[in-house]
Design a protein with these regions (language model features):
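Short beta-alpha connecting loops at secondary-structure transitions
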Residues: 25-29, 69-71, 264-280, 302-319, ...
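Long, amphipathic alpha-helical stalk/connector segments used for oligomerization, subunit docking
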Residues: 287-359
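Generic, well-ordered alpha-helical scaffold segments in large soluble proteins
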Residues: 43-47, 87, 91, 131, ...
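Glycine-rich anion/phosphate-binding loop at the beta-strand->alpha-helix junction
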Residues: 172, 187, 219-303
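A helix-coil-helix interface module used to build multimeric assemblies
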Residues: 1-186, 192, 200-205, 214, ...
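Conserved beta-strand/loop scaffold segments within soluble protein domains that form the structured core
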Residues: 162, 196, 203-236
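Acidic-glycine-rich active-site phosphate/pyrophosphate-binding loop
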Residues: 14-17, 142, 203-219, 256-257, ...
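Short amphipathic alpha-helical segments with heptad-repeat character
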Residues: 115-122, 126, 133, 163-166, ...
Length: 372
């Protein structure tokens, strides 16, 4: 029996996918990435050779994608596009791969994955922000002791605290929404020689067909579009990790100021009520800095095409989007329906809360203006 380890439902970490509720499974899978290569080739035929577009589409539609087999063959040439184009041209070369190089198709396919995957992260962040806004409004005057450098400090309000979470989450969502996902089209050495002088015209049409951003430039060896996406994702992961860390602290037995709606148990200690969602969020988010570092290291894209640095991006960027989605999803689960033990909070307060309520109100104003 053929192994199913490359089935589209298992091409990513199962734990990571389930933690993100599964929504990001399809957009970031290896199968979708490879299918997007075909999507880009079909769009390129329309943009570069419209007279052959129908034949190219028929060729692509007739192609039977075998993810496992194509992945094996990709190792021989260093990327999956080489054997894919060979297969397509063997069926009918008309309209296939006009004026493009492997990097054009692969980078554009990756951007299709990321546009959808990042959009799913934004949706989760917005859900979290809505819940935080409700929490902030409800508890803007709820007194709690502030803590700095791990020690009891001065009184504040729980709403002021969650207001800080809210603004950071909203900022992270807006940064992701502002990202551009550029199409790539430059040809063999990035100078559009084969299609001169129509290169940028074709690029613009290709961007339109795919719903991607037209950079009006060739970015083969400029990997800043990748690091821009990666930075925004890693920032979002860090933002929710901070929230998760706070929830874990406030949920400690000796603190007891918060309790998740559905806390996790223990296989050996049945009395425990672990803040499982916050803990999982922390775990996923901790993977983001290492993935981000790999992508920044890939900025060293030598000459006109990276030797290994470019190849390192394909899985790493999708993995970063996946762990960020999982982290945000777990943070949203942690906050949704969380119990705020106001009496326990108040029992530790030793004075007035100052102007903390004003800060909670301001956080709500900032959030409201950003979404109006």
């Amino acid at each position: 029996m053929k192994p199913h380890f490359l089935d589209s439902k298992l091409t990513r970490s199962l734990y990571s996918d389930l933690a993100g509720s599964g929504e990001h499974l399809s957009s970031l899978s290896d199968e979708t990435f490879l299918k997007n290569l075909l999507v880009v080739e079909a769009a390129l035929a329309v943009a570069a050779a419209p007279e052959h577009a129908a034949m190219a589409k028929a060729t692509i539609d007739s192609y039977q994608l075998d993810v496992e087999e194509l992945s094996r063959r990709a190792a021989e040439g260093g990327n999956p596009l080489i054997p894919l184009v060979t297969d397509l041209k063997a069926i009918n070369p008309a309209g296939i791969h006009i004026g493009a190089t492997s990097q054009d198709i692969i980078d554009s396919a990756l951007m299709l994955c990321m546009k959808e995957g990042v959009g799913e992260v934004v949706d989760k962040l917005k859900k979290l922000a809505r819940d935080l806004a409700e929490l902030t409004a409800e508890h803007k005057a709820t007194p709690i002791m502030g803590r700095t450098l791990g020690q009891i400090a001065t009184p504040t309000t729980f709403g002021a605290l969650t207001g800080g979470w809210l603004v950071a989450v909203d900022n992270a969502a807006r940064a992701l929404e502002a990202l551009e996902f550029p199409v790539s089209y430059g040809g063999a050495s990035g100078n559009m020689t084969v299609v001169h002088p129509r290169g940028f015209e074709i690029q613009a049409k290709l961007a339109e067909e795919l719903g991607l951003f037209d950079p009006q430039w060739v970015w083969h060896s400029d990997r800043t579009p990748i690091t821009a996406i990666a930075s925004a994702l890693a920032t979002a992961a860090g933002v929710v990790r901070k929230i998760a860390g706070d929830v874990v602290f406030y949920s400690q037995t000796e603190v007891g100021e918060l309790r998740e709606k559905s806390p996790g148990g223990s296989s050996a200690m049945p009395h425990k009520a672990n803040p499982a969602a916050a803990i999982a969020c922390d775990g996923y988010a901790r993977r983001a800095p290492g993935l981000l570092a790999t992508l920044f290291d890939a900025l060293d894209c030598r000459l006109q095409r990276g030797t290994g640095s470019w190849h390192a991006e394909w899985a790493t960027l999708r993995e970063l989007a996946a762990v960020t989605h999982s982290a945000v999803s777990r943070a949203a689960t942690s906050i949704d329906g969380i119990t705020v033990n106001v009496d326990v909070m108040a029992s530790r307060v030793n004075g007035p809360t100052g102007h903390a309520e004003d800060l909670a109100e301001r956080a709500l104003e900032i959030y409201g203006k950003g979404r109006s």
